[in-house]
């Protein structure tokens, strides 16, 4: 009997599925733990939950569940246009920012092309390139971040996309705005630069690149953002891209007709209005980062200075020690993110939680380190 999977292209069959952070429900099933006692610090979610305004909007949107959503996302795009100072025809909505990343990839990459990203880039980038048969080029990192000069040097006539996450996930590093602007000025105009700003809301104003203003001068720039992080809407999947009108038009042509659901549209529009909630998320993260890094210092654990809502910890010794620590934390009801799929075998990524969650992690880590000895 024919194995139909063999008819798929080799590059599709070679794909390794993306591994998300372990869900709380899975840990409860596996270890029989009480759900309320589990602390999840694995997926860079907002520990404050969701904006009250967004919650109310979602409840109201449920009344229209039998209706298809507005496929154009007119009202959300209008709200984003007003907030960001961008024409609505330069905004593309997506089912999370991963969706708009994939749209750009499908348009510009093909089996004879290449995509460039950093060694420790978001794991989705190489998957997106592989899914269309393009060749991914991982440029060696510089201090766990982007080496922009090396990325420029890696550009060839076959290069169609360069991915840059700023701040970077999973390392939390940040490219200086001036360096990024000089980079954009030197990138060939026929190479699309995708600037993934999923964690932009966690940056102090002094560190923000003001990249939206660059769109006027660089037609080859696409900026992606999400409502999953600071806005606390990870489960309803809403993201967006900002691009030159011609590129946005192409992205809108190939996206699914109703790629953002009604509940997500309503929640995102309401969340945009809740400025105080986002400010609180920012301040909670700053305070939590100080608590977390102070605790790691006390334990003698090295970490990568982070501009996101997470911190990347280094566990000394053989990589097996890192897995032992990870599993021990699970036994204690604390979920963090191992980074073996990033070839960071001695690292764990930890989301910044509220004070009690951070304390719980640090106590569990201290216990795990003792048991490792």
Swiss-Prot record:
SUPFAM superfamilies for this protein: PLP-dependent transferases
Which co-factors does it depend on?
pyridoxal 5'-phosphate
Q: Specify the enzyme's EC class, one word.
A: transferase
GO molecular function, a single term: histidinol-phosphate transaminase activity
Q: Does the keyword Zinc apply?
A: no
BP term (GO), one: L-histidine biosynthetic process
EC number, as in UniProt = 2.6.1.9
Record pathway: Amino-acid biosynthesis; L-histidine biosynthesis; L-histidine from 5-phospho-alpha-D-ribose 1-diphosphate: step 7/9
Mind listing the UniProt keywords for this protein, alphabetically? Amino-acid biosynthesis, Aminotransferase, Histidine biosynthesis, Pyridoxal phosphate, Transferase
- The N6-(pyridoxal phosphate)lysine modification is found at 229
Catalytic activity as recorded in UniProt: L-histidinol phosphate + 2-oxoglutarate = 3-(imidazol-4-yl)-2-oxopropyl phosphate + L-glutamate
Source organism, top-level taxon: Bacteria
NCBIfam families, from UniProt?
Answer: hisC
UniProt lists the family membership as follows: Belongs to the class-II pyridoxal-phosphate-dependent aminotransferase family. Histidinol-phosphate aminotransferase subfamily.
**What is the annotated quaternary arrangement, including any partners?**
Homodimer.
The name this protein goes by in its record: Histidinol-phosphate aminotransferase 2
Please report the organism this UniProt entry assigns to the protein. Answer: Nitrosomonas europaea (strain ATCC 19718 / CIP 103999 / KCTC 2705 / NBRC 14298)
